[in-house]
């Protein structure tokens, strides 16, 4: 995971990404690259719930992990909120974010984010 304090990059846009999927063994988009416009995503919170036990994470369009891997039990979940000055940053500009997992099964994921240079 890479942490980038946003002091040098003023917030320009923010939003919420939501995904409900039956299978994330193939990464599924939660926010698309079209919304990025030469900026990085800074993730400020994550809520992830899963039906099947497995390992899950958020990655960019190039399959580079943005979060660590969450090893979750069946019907498990995780909730995470970043301190204001240390959000998780996507590694490169112009990349969307996807949810990926090691097993098929219903998942729900919500992230909050802002975009900045």
Sequence positions of predicted segments:
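C-terminal interaction-tip segments
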Residues: 1-42, 92-94, 100-117
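A signal for specific C-terminal beta-sheet/loop modules enriched in small/flexible residues
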Residues: 23-24, 67-84, 112-117
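Charged, amphipathic alpha-helical segments
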Residues: 42-43, 82
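Extended, low-complexity, turn-rich repeat/linker tracts enriched in Gly/Pro/Ser/Thr and Asp/Glu
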Residues: 47-57, 101-108
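Short, surface-exposed beta-strand/strand-loop-strand elements in extracellular ectodomains
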Residues: 51-70, 111
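Beta-sandwich interaction modules
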Residues: 73-96, 100-103
């Amino acid at each position: 995971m890479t942490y980038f304090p946003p002091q040098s990059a003023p917030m320009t846009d923010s939003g919420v990404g939501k995904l409900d999927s039956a299978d994330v063994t193939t990464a599924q988009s939660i926010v698309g690259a079209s919304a990025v416009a030469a900026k990085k995503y800074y993730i400020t919170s994550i809520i992830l719930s899963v039906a099947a036990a497995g390992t899950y994470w958020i990655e960019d369009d190039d399959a580079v992990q943005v979060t660590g891997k969450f090893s979750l039990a069946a019907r498990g979940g995780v909730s995470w909120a970043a301190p204001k000055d240390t959000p998780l940053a996507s590694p490169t500009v112009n990349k969307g974010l996807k949810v990926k997992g090691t097993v098929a099964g219903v998942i729900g994921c919500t992230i909050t984010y802002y975009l900045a240079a």
